[in-house]
Amino acid sequence: MDHSIEVTFRVKTQQVIIPEQNIRGNELPLRRWQMELLMLDATGKEVEPTILSKCIYHLHSSFKQPKRRLNSLPFFIKETGWGEFNLKIECFFIGNAGKFSIEHDLTFEDDAYAVDYTVDVPHEFSHLNSELSKYFDLPWKVVSPEEEMSLRIADLPWIKSLALIDEDMMTDVVQMILNDPAVQRAIENHPRREQFFMFITQLPDDLLMKIQAFLKLPNKNSTKQERTNFGSDAIHKDEPVKAHNKLK
């Protein structure tokens, strides 16, 4: 099963020369320019990128405030300057579901232009799924976070057995969780200065199945090496598709 859906983001740029300037010699004229990040829905219509929680524009270092962090929609900036440059636009998915970057060129060849960028958006996060379903026909079932939590808790009675295992087995279970790529990605994308919490029902299904199978290993018949080998599966399994930008 595919782990992502392709979504197109559009960066729209407009610029104009500021009138009545006293330009001397080879001086370049000052311009006002603005830039906005949008998303295209399934029909190609421009919509606000509500699947993003924040956006950071990394402008040229000559600007007084080159790093522009926008924590809410619209992801729009307005500036004045005379030079063209390449900038990075850092985008963060809602629900700590990852991030991606766009490399965009600010040019003055046209008064207005738009550039599209295609991004693979991961689907293993319920909050992100719910928002995506407003714009796309998803190839998987979408449930609310509350429904997902209720369904998975009801289907995982074996979780109670975690309270009964010994310290060595608990250490192995924790290591399996920390070695999982999806968990590692969630940790990496979480703000470093904030505490990180993850409920067991938020873990990927394949990881939960491995933990369940691991807990069924009879303690008296399974050696430490067997448990170690079982837990290492999380390290060698195929990496999930990650969000990334495909520049056109």
UniProtKB/Swiss-Prot annotation:
Any one Gene Ontology BP term:
chromatin remodeling
Task: Extract the PROSITE patterns matched here.
Answer: YEATS
Signal peptide residues on this chain, from the entry's feature table? none
**Entry-linked CDD domains:** YEATS_Taf14_like
The PTM Phosphoserine maps to: 144
Write out the transmembrane intervals.
none
What are the record keywords, sorted? Chromatin regulator, Nucleus, Phosphoprotein, Repressor, Transcription, Transcription regulation
Q: Which domain of life is it from?
A: Eukaryota
Annotated Gene Ontology MF terms?
Answer: acetyltransferase activity; histone acetyltransferase activity; histone binding
**Where are the annotated segments for Disordered?**
223-248
The terms describing its cellular component in GO are:
chromatin; chromosome, telomeric region; Ino80 complex; nucleus; SAS acetyltransferase complex; SWI/SNF complex; transcription factor TFIID complex; transcription factor TFIIF complex
Q: Supply the Gene3D superfamilies for this chain.
A: YEATS domain (2.60.40.1970)
Further information in the entry reads: Present with 1800 molecules/cell in log phase SD medium.
| This protein's name | Something about silencing protein 5
